[in-house]
């Protein structure tokens, strides 16, 4: 760990010590460099930074919250500090990071998972916290479950549809909210029976191993709800090995717009796909750039906002996103989204439609 900390410190010196741009931003990416979602998330941020003239640095924590905290400590208490720190409240690390940031001179912005009510009460109002942008995770889980049920053939009165669910981590806000949305949809459809919900840790191999065991116990399952694409593919592999045909014998759902997930929608192997939240970091940079130029974010939708980014992606849109995917910025002109000089009625167009122009 000491070697890792020394390496991070050297990196900070190289990055921020020579910074000549008006604003420097460090993003603490909680994910892995092997995860398609978090890589695409970073790529979209980098595209935004280039267009906006922001000096952006990204550090990955490789799914280790203790590494996120170590990175934050060096950024906030070291000699070369960024102007802004963007981070995720993954595994509820935000209060610790905010304590480190006290009197550091670094401004904070939270993405993807904001402060919980209890955390907000704990840290109170802070002038250094600029704002937050989070997706509609609860609604996303609900929409995905509703779409699966809609696509499933109707059953006779008294018969049931059997479901397996793969959630992420118990201590991840996005996982909890998507799960909550799924349960809300199930309450509206008593004919669907949730056989078991397991935590796949967002990982394909773990979901595969879990699905193999669950299939023996519940051979009549015909719906699989998964909180991300990796777990959906792991479960799909287990069902395929058992002789089940994805999209016919069993309907699968997932979240994330990885190329593999988009292709699975086009091929019919994934029946319901939600995505769009990989853009949150890029949108956050638009707001930070506006803030740097004196824009009052409260006048343009508020500083803490939930954005309805998670939307159902059909075959047409999946193919369109695949065709556009070679360009990580999706052709977005980030500067044109600025609220500077616009009337108070203006709202940032942070949605999938902005990518589908």
Give residue ranges: language-model regions.
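Extracytoplasmic "Venus flytrap"
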Residues: 24-44, 48, 57-71, 89-92, ...
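Short, solvent-exposed amphipathic alpha-helices that sit
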Residues: 36-52, 140-147, 173-192, 210, ...
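Venus flytrap/periplasmic-binding-protein-like
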Residues: 108-120, 225-270, 279
